[in-house]
Curated annotation (Swiss-Prot):
Its main location: cytoplasm. It is an enzyme of class 2 (transferase). Keywords: Amino-acid biosynthesis, Arginine biosynthesis, Cytoplasm, Transferase. This is Ornithine carbamoyltransferase. It comes from the Bacteria. L-ornithine binds at N156, D220, S224, M225. It is found in: Cytoplasm. It comes from Campylobacter jejuni (strain RM1221). It catalyses: carbamoyl phosphate + L-ornithine = L-citrulline + phosphate + H(+). The keyword Cytoplasm applies. Carbamoyl phosphate binds at S46, T47, R48, T49, Q73, R97, H124, P125, T126, Q127, C260, L261, R288.
Amino acid sequence: MKHFLTLRDFSKEEILSLVNHASELKKEPKKLLQDKTLAMIFEKNSTRTRMAFELAITELGGKALFLSSNDLQLSRGEPVKDTARVIGAMVDFVMMRVNKHETLLEFARYSKAPVINALSELYHPTQVLGDLLTIKEWNKMQNGIAKVAFIGDSNNMCNSWLIAAAILGFEFSIAIPKNYKISPEIWEFAMKQALISGAKISLSHDRFEALKDKDVVITDTWVSMGEENEKERKIKEFEGFMIDEKAMSVANKDAILLHCLPAYRGYEVSEEIFEKHADVIFEEARNRLYVVKALLCFLDNQRGRE
């Protein structure tokens, strides 16, 4: 069964097809999943992700079932595989926002319904789909190639974008602090994919080096959920990595800024630059709705072929 746990399980053609279908559904809504049910399991708080998934399945003609960790016997020690067997047999899709990626993998092994990663500590693939739709809409993809820079933490967003860029053949530069590392296994996968796709990928510890000649600039919060007690340390480590006027001046003249939100002005991005690119950033957030619609339809079609 086809799940959506990471973009590395999808081909270039499948990823682009999802983005194109999302664009079509944005222009012309259709009720393609009449009476289908989506279970939404949250171990972490969410604003945009919950709204995108709940609205997506509703507007497609289905219904959503919200389940926090407190609603499930998982919080009392029930094995993940048992919960997966029950929920996966009752619904058509399962969306999960989890603390550990291993929870997703275990759930997917035993679920009879396709499982979607709505965020783990390793990956955030639905966000990247939304980013890709936004890049398409702002005409920042020339001949199928975008020039993208990611500035910030070597986190789930960085990992997901690295994989996407490698599969799609993009020019992609990363800038992270010196004591931060990309997962060796994820980096190796990306390098192998880049050889196939022709992607040009680079890693540095200098934001200006990464930003040079880029059309798309991506950043993310420096302090992720669950890292609040590390805030002071991380702010010191990320000194010099803010996306401000000086940083954006190194990118191409009409470069756009993307941020998955929530944004913390004065840290990863300046107030002035955030507001300058607010139209793009909030359309990026809205685009999550349409890529989720396309993803649900894709998984439903895949399941129908089995």
